[in-house]
Amino acid sequence: MKTIHISLAMGAALLFVGCQSTTDSHKVSQHRSDAVFHIERAAAATLAQETTELVSAFVHYCQLPEAGMDTVKKQWHRSMLSWMALQGQERGPAAALEQSWNVQFWPDKKNTTGRKMSALIQQNTTWKADDIAAQSVTVQGLGAIEWLLYDESSDLSRNAQTCQTGVAISRHLNQNTQRISDAWSSNPWVLLNEKEWHSEYISLLSNQLEYAMKKLSRPLANIGQPRPYFSESWRSQTSLSNLKANVEVLKALYLANGEGLDATLRGMDKAELADRVVNQFDVTLATWPEQTSLFAALQDKEGYRMALTQLRKLEQLKYLIHDEVAVELGVVIGFNATDGD
């Protein structure tokens, strides 16, 4: 399968962040969390923009199906990659966090998306965005659109009504991502003192890192008994591309344009620890597999070992942030709501 270039979606977001760090400094009251907030706000804005483009791509495809699905598929990938910046968050504006399941239903342990989408397109209904909002979350988000574009059971290419269903789902998704962007228009952390912010910051990183780790550990399951259908984007075969984007975003959040945890540690004369964290990010990304499909990798022992190796690297990263960095900052990380589910 053609390699998905992460920089397409993530590069735009990080460029936007770099611009904001200088242009917004005179507009926003200075707070130790500002650099991280700018990243989050830019990521949310990028997600909303990419899903706006997804609506346009879907509408164009439905009008000219003979042009093929390539454009809408590429735009779906861009939208998915932009979502990786916010995926797994448990810190931030409540109005943004409450949209998570609407944007993406995962894990899907029982192929609920497949069953619900099959039932949806079989109904003799011209769906609108408002109608989709009243349906199960499994047919509302990125996974539902992936099913339409990639699943063998989808009749998208030969059924105009199914195509309009795709437009409706895309529009509803765009509305929800715009709500996320709106929620990130102001900094939710401005009232936190230094210790509270450090706790929130480390929790933000830990939550997203742990979510990314689950995207490997669930499909890996028990040694010798993988569950490839538990992979995040198994239909489009882009699970590993998504995960690389997760790690890239976590590194950007950790560094926060020179104003993040890395700078904090160095200011405390903990450069050795800071170097180890950065090195772990760098090694993880530099050795990330070219293969984009976790589903395909789990079909043989070599691929399983490769995926397990990536998980071990993320576990080391978690140890460094969750234990060593947190201890140096005097932060105690509490129970994570995603643990044990």
Question: Where are the language model's segments positioned?
Answer:
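Bacterial N-terminal signal peptides that target proteins for export
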Residues: 1-8
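C-terminal motif of bacterial Sec signal peptides marking the signal peptidase cleavage site
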Residues: 15-18
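Short, conserved catalytic or interaction motifs in soluble domains
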Residues: 21
